[in-house]
């Protein structure tokens, strides 16, 4: 061997997985660029026959805090690009979301002119994306890709801080053959009683 196996001691492995299959907006330097990227993504999904009005188009990792004041998210901009197709975009730090009107209705969130959903409401809304049609199958496929991606980087173990029942989640994943990493499952205080039981 060349070096010991690496550990990622603070990851959100589900989110890592999603970056491999969802629209990545990390390179967008403005709301305009993010919407250009979204427009291209929606167009590609449509041309491949994968655009379903009952499923969310999800994007990740926009950084609006780095954008100029006149290049901030707006509900009008995302509605103009997405129309009736539900679209939910998560910020890079996961502390807010940018949704269009169709997604806001489906998720049951209120948005103003910015189209942004604040931190606590976004945490709950983002979790509801996992209940959408086809989401479980997508996640299973992406988890396997992420496990392979981690191995390719020399990562043999992770400490997972997803906001979920991580012990039960990982027990189920291991049972389903997603077992190529050593996992230390983080537990948030509000879920401690579930971990103890």
Please describe what each predicted stretch is.
Residues 1-197:
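Divalent metal-binding segments
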